[in-house]
């Protein structure tokens, strides 16, 4: 669950919370914090504890640990609440909830206008109140989604703040405040080469700048003024941010900021309308800005080796020229529905993520030639029925997942020449077919699909015959009924002589 701490990300906080019960009154035994792991438990975090204590020996001091325990009460309480409320909704669900709330508000305004224009205005206030109450009731579910997302977002910030707080407590305990001040001090290093480049650009137009491997920690704002720049290579530096002024590079075609320490990209990156190649791999990005969708000329986007959990909801609607998308080694749980609109996409690598499936729109990627979905492990269990529509697919890697059955129309992937299905609990097709290779798999799935279609056609024909039989019976019955009605009508219309017996008095 999202509430579980990763010792690698929060080493001190994990250590303190694991030992929290030893500093808690017996009456609080119902706390959500687990007792310290047993040394005999093979899944124990004892190795982590030994490692962190070795690195930070003062953690074992009771006074230090007690101070840290008091500083983690908010984390424990929040974690308990989130465990009750459930996991964080994905980005697309949140976006849809926001959109639905806007639609509801717009509908409410229209309702008020209709009520105000109604001829009977006596009950206007009452009608408006009832409508408002109904709308608020409808909004509860969508608001709860947004609220849950906000709680999880706040919890993640809380964890980071708590970890930093505990580190400060520890450093204060060992009287190492000087190191903290040194780490927090802003260090600006712009070497002579950077200054020289800026001076050269002021005198003569530059179309290419390569500053890779220079250990740069800062990119000067002045770079945004080199308007003739076409290629900017900042690979393998120590950059923590890209200045907003990069939006001034209106003619930029290629931007490489891979292998840095970037945690975010500026929203202004969306103003690079001519950008064709963007490499942001090997950073610390958790999201891509929504504005990246405005880079409509992008042909290649490499966002691999980051901490992304989702892609922008509308990325497929606007990046229609994208041919190559690299998002492997992230933490992406789902792909947006809009990805099906990337009709130019030929290469997609999404291995080593947390994908739990693909949207039905995925089958619209009819130009896709290479697809790697391997190593999504237990999260990826099936593929959409539209998967068979990927008619241009040549290479497919589905290894190391939990797929039990390939889609029925898999046999229609006539251009598929390379297929990896290793480490899947496949039932359809059976293992003996898989071992024979890609052609055997396609043939097996193709025959299976044809058999299914023939069976469906047979059932449809039987149904048509039954319907026809019922129609014939109904026609005959209707004909008989019409004949009977006609005979009765003729009899009544002939006015037979009245029976004298009926005229007798009782």
UniProtKB/Swiss-Prot annotation:
Region span, Disordered: 24-48
Disruption phenotype: No visible phenotype. Pirl1 and pirl9 double mutant is lethal due to a male-specific transmission failure leading to a severe pollen malformation.
Highest taxon of the lineage: Eukaryota
Cross-referenced InterPro entries: Leu-rich_rpt, Leu-rich_rpt_typical-subtyp, LRR_dom_sf, LRR_domain-containing
Expressed in which tissues: Widely expressed.
The entry's keywords: Coiled coil, Leucine-rich repeat, Repeat
Placement of LRR repeats on the sequence: 203-225, 226-249, 251-272, 273-295, 297-319, 320-342, 344-364, 365-389, 390-412, 414-436
Residues forming coiled coils: 143-193
Residue window of motif GVYW: 437-449
A biological process from GO: microgametogenesis
SUPFAM superfamilies, alphabetized: L domain-like (SSF52058)
Family membership: Belongs to the SHOC2 family.
Described function: Leucine-rich repeat protein that likely mediates protein interactions, possibly in the context of signal transduction. PIRL1 acts redundantly with PIRL9 in the differentiation of microspores into pollen.
Protein name, UniProt field: Plant intracellular Ras-group-related LRR protein 1
Organism per entry: Arabidopsis thaliana (Mouse-ear cress)
Name of the encoding gene: PIRL1
